[in-house]
Amino acid sequence: MCGRSGLISTAVCPCATGLICQQRICRQPSTYKISVLMQLSEKPGPIGVFDSGYGGLTILHQMRNILPHYDYLYLGDNARAPYGARSFDVVYQFTRQAVIKLFSMGCHLVILACNTVSAKALRSIQQNDLPSLDPNRRVLGIIRPTAECIGSITQSRHVGIVATEGTIKSESYVLEINKLFPDITVTGEPCPMWVPLVENNEYDGPGADYFVKKRIENLMIRDPQIDSIILGCTHYPLLLNKILKYTPRGVKIVPQGEYVSNSLKDYFVRHPDIEAKCTKNGLCHYLTTENTDKFRESAQLFLHERVDVENITLG
């Protein structure tokens, strides 16, 4: 379950969330006009879920399993994906555009269902933008819930992280886990080809075997004592069969969806004011910045169902 807020820096997070406040780079307050505050509806709305691509659908899928009565609005910035190798500032600007869009469509709570976004943009959004956009709305990330749970999973106290280059370079998992569990050794392995394998529907082919085997072997060579591997990218559950194939026997694989969803459930118990602003009709709507036919086809890989989707423009 999600614990109380713990920041990487000494700055205070204005939203006091129980999920993550991750980014280590502070920026100047947003120049976005305070008048936006007056334009946002106070009526309850869906839970916003944002990802740069399709991976966040694995988080959404678990949310709908564990919290099925809520309404969800998923936004995928597929036209500009992947975010993994982009700079902190570019990821922040793209994420800010998405959050503003979801707020304008009635969301009072937005989940950044992307590790790169949670690592590179969350803290700036929380500290610099929410006070002017609407201090009563919330933007939460997905790294903290995973970090909180790993302490009860690892026995050797040696944990591996497989993630995008951006997430690994941010050291968000290392810092968050070490803050919660100083006795745990964390080793990160960047996997730059894994997201393209999923996005191009090649996650079950021979190319996937090559790239997954290479990265898992690299990780285990660097620290043979690892007994738990966190899938630090929401795309990676689709590679689970390949990952299990090349992971040594006895090493646990830790996907994020279940932990993030249970953390959100716990968050609602502790924040009934936010929970009351989330509508409950069991509905889900999808938005994408790319071709809707492509999104619809790719989404079926993650959700195993056909979805209705609307094209939008960000920026």
Predicted features along the sequence, with ranges:
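Non-catalytic structural scaffold of enzyme domains
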Residues: 38-315
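Cysteine-centered motifs
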Residues: 2, 13-15, 21, 26
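Short, low-complexity interaction segments enriched in Ser/Thr/Pro/Gly
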Residues: 5, 17, 30-31
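Acidic, Ala/Val/Gly-enriched low-complexity intrinsically disordered segments
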Residues: 11-12, 16, 36
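Extended, compositionally biased low-complexity polar/Lys-Gly-rich tracts
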Residues: 25, 29, 139-141
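Short, Lys/Arg-enriched N-terminal segments with co-localized hydrophobic residues
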Residues: 27-37
